[in-house]
Amino acid sequence: MEDEGFVDDDFIDDTAREFVGRYGIASLAVLREHAAIAEAAGDYLLAQMWREVVEAAERMLT
């Protein structure tokens, strides 16, 4: 994601780790909801960031 130039990988991983630590497997649903809310509000960059966090959380949980 760092290549795209808007949020660095450490932030994505740290955020995913925080959600996984707090919510466990349920973090995926919580994070997907954040992405959906951002997209519904028209904030596509924020929605993309949340989707990246979902992917990082999925990697941590597998």
Spell out what each predicted region is.
Residues 1-41, 45, 52, 59-62:
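Long, non-catalytic architectural segments outside compact domain cores
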